Amino acid sequence: MLILVSPAKTLDYETPASTQTFTMPALLEHSEALIKVCRELTPADIASLMKVSDKIAGLNAARFAEWHRDFNLDNAKQALFAFRGDVYTGLDADTLSEGSLARAQQHLRILSGLYGLLRPLDLMQAYRLEMGTKLANDRGANLYQFWGDIVTQEVNKALAEQGDDILVNLASNEYFKSVKPKQIQGQVITPIFKDKKNGQYKVISFFAKKARGMMVRYMLDNKVSRYEELLKFDTAGYYYSEADSSVNEPVFLREEQA
């Protein structure tokens, strides 16, 4: 199984990663092309384009200016340990065993507006460039047009190395739009997480994001390799609801949280 997740806006370059092992992103030439476009933006442009504060815009203008391809452990960090946010809280990478981390490197991929597709141990320099950003570039009006088929091709390459054809999509809609499902050489499974609130089960963003990370952790720790095993996910009170599910969209429910 190959697992896809989104990145996070929040980054942590202060806490040391739990390993010194690293790999390099596969699509850096494309990242470099995007950086050249981003360097032409003023902080005011960035604030408007990304809908962020002047402070965050200034920080990211500086990041674009300082970015260079000579990645090392002094100026970059492994992606899985650099991202913080609800998904990554659920995943809790800092406590992964050596075996689970090795499985993550093989079976987990992180979609990225700047880097396209990252393996967990791929080094990355700090950035903010969400996939939905309407950044005009030589290939089109936005990042979806910039990446075109490139991300999908990388996903298919990773799928081919899995030994099966199941892609577990735990990414947000914004990020999964960078993948072309009809071109995926396998079956796409998109788990749905619903929490009970006021007597109804519904997708609550904060809980759903965290649940995606918890499912990644469950799959890595339990060496999940078959669809049936995925349905046994039961972390934090979630349970599979066959009545609410389809084959490609298994639904996991949880009772109201106190």
From Swiss-Prot:
Gene Ontology biological process terms, A to Z: response to hydroperoxide
Highest rank taxon of the organism: Bacteria
Pfam families from the UniProt entry: H2O2_YaaD
UniProt-listed InterPro entries: YaaA
GO CC, one annotated term: cytosol
HAMAP family: UPF0246
NCBIfam families: PRK02101.1-1, PRK02101.1-3
Family: Belongs to the UPF0246 family.
PANTHER family linked: PEROXIDE STRESS RESISTANCE PROTEIN YAAA, PEROXIDE STRESS RESPONSE PROTEIN YAAA
UniProt name for this protein: UPF0246 protein Shew_1093
